[in-house]
């Protein structure tokens, strides 16, 4: 960051390190562009009108893909009280279908967590969740030959618990209920991050309110073919709001490339015979 030959910085990682980079650049000799992607605590809202099978599949893909070790993982779900039990059962069933094993083999969908530190963090969180919430499925370590853990769905964790706002980077998703859609939006926005978010609803008014109100850089409605919170960087900008990013083009695709380019306004004032001769030879054109 301090090297005079560095014209710009791109960083993907923790909020703490990202903010340290900003501070160093701000205290430097000259301004330089900084592109960051500093994580997320990504919510999904499941409305009363939602297709629950669609929602359960989309949330499972978002929560457990790459063992939850992605900044766009869905880690909290707000479900209308009238359909909470039905949705939670469907999500737990989706988690139970996940094939866990060597991720280099095609038959396995979820591999191990990255290292012992993550493995021990999973164990510690699960131990606390057993006493504070209701583990619907998962909560177990698996093959002792690797850092394999079970995809975990948790209900009834008090909403003032720190895990509602802490990025876990683990295959753990929390589920709670709401009775008013505005209440769900307020809860979804009540974190320091704003990377991705998802919503399942067949009510056009709710969908419009979600799109207008949610504080996240990448949002999806009724998505199930891939994760309901996720990234599609080859096709659209990927970045976040608040503590997730300083730009909505944090990674991927042509939008990302634009941030490595510099603008320059160029003006030529034509005077004298030389310009006319160049035009006649075709060496200068508009």
Q: Model-found features: residue ranges?
A:
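Conserved C-terminal structural/oligomerization subdomain of aldehyde/semialdehyde dehydrogenase
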Residues: 3-6, 45, 99-103, 110-111, ...
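ALDH superfamily catalytic-core signature
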Residues: 4, 8, 16-158, 181-182, ...
